[in-house]
């Protein structure tokens, strides 16, 4: 997939406040500070998604219109300890509404930090998406920070944990080196063309 143009067209802060569905869309979700905005910028090949050093900055669902016909959707990060219980409930309601009501959603890309074992919040997200029958692919981020001698071990560690929930594609990526970006774009292209 060649991304020719990208535009942030909607910032949704309340359930149902979404743009009309298009031909297809994919969404990206992960723990706060997992590198979601950096990965989106790498996919877009331009800096359009805001990257923050402060975890938990994305408190909305951001819809990026790609090539004037698809949405790439940036979901708010989860698992940030300094967020109040009320904010966590608002996040859950917003994301659950999105998952249940976007018929054009082809795939969710679950971003997981490749440097560390999957966290409890990642596994809860897997269970939640499975319970809602949401198709997802696991994307390991920050792989440039994993030593070459440890990569096979880290990949196997993630495969072993996630295999308890079923068979899932795992794509190692780095927004710094570009690793996995073309593979991810190819998968997205296939998904969107099938729609």
Swiss-Prot record:
Coiled coil: none annotated. Residues 22-194 form the EngB-type G domain. One of its GO terms (biological process) is division septum assembly. InterPro entries: G_ENGB_dom (IPR030393), GTP-bd (IPR006073), GTP-bd_ribosome_bio_YsxC (IPR019987), P-loop_NTPase (IPR027417), Small_GTP-bd (IPR005225). It comes from the Bacteria. One of its GO terms (molecular function) is metal ion binding. GTP binds at residues 30-37, 56-60, 74-77, 141-144, 173-175. Keywords: Cell cycle, Cell division, GTP-binding, Magnesium, Metal-binding, Nucleotide-binding, Septation. Mg(2+) binds at residues 37, 58. The keyword Ligase does not apply. Its cofactor is Mg(2+). The keyword Cell cycle applies. GO terms for cellular component: cytosol. Belongs to the TRAFAC class TrmE-Era-EngA-EngB-Septin-like GTPase superfamily. EngB GTPase family. PANTHER family: ENGB-TYPE G DOMAIN-CONTAINING PROTEIN, MSS1/TRME-RELATED GTP-BINDING PROTEIN. HAMAP family: GTPase_EngB. Necessary for normal cell division and for the maintenance of normal septation. This is Probable GTP-binding protein EngB. It comes from Thermotoga maritima (strain ATCC 43589 / DSM 3109 / JCM 10099 / NBRC 100826 / MSB8).
